[in-house]
Amino acid sequence: MSQVEIRKVNQDELSLLQKIAIQTFRETFAFDNTAEQLQNFFDEAYTLSALKLELADKESETYFILMSGKAAGFLKVNWDSSQTEQVLEDAFEIQRVYILKAYQGLGLGKQLFEFALERAQISGLSWVWLGVWEKNVKAQLLYAKYGFEQFSKHSFFVGNKVDTDWLLKKSLS
């Protein structure tokens, strides 16, 4: 059986984080976006300088999930002023949970998501929330199993294309 480990991403792993972030986003959303839209998104969200700032943020954490020592995906969580939006008082945001396609179906996404929920629980905050693409029914059903409910929605830009994300929340009390 392969060993699974979840650990924080280090500053010296920025290139690996960038590679995995781009690859997982492309694998997940390329079917609904042009190459230009994806590249514009990557040029904004996944530059080395943007990722370096995220890793340095004291109100945000980024983790790799490793299988047999190889990065298989990543997680990013935020709280306080580092949340992508201030939509709930006293809240913890799960911003990104991505698993490389080659590692999907092995339960790694579930492990990473449950790790995020544990981080939310020990934060002492009242709510955990996340955004999910309105067309990603599979993820919506998963989040519903964990007790998340839709409370709002927002626009998510991939290049010049506007998608709608549902905002889901769960009480931590």
Question: How does the language model describe each region?
Answer:
Residues 8-14, 18-31, 39-102, 113-115, ...:
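Acetyl-CoA-dependent GNAT
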Residues 88-92, 126-140, 144-146, 152-173:
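C-terminal "cap" of GNAT-fold acetyltransferases
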Residues 100-102, 106, 134-135:
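Active-site acidic-Proline motif in GNAT/NAT acetyltransferases
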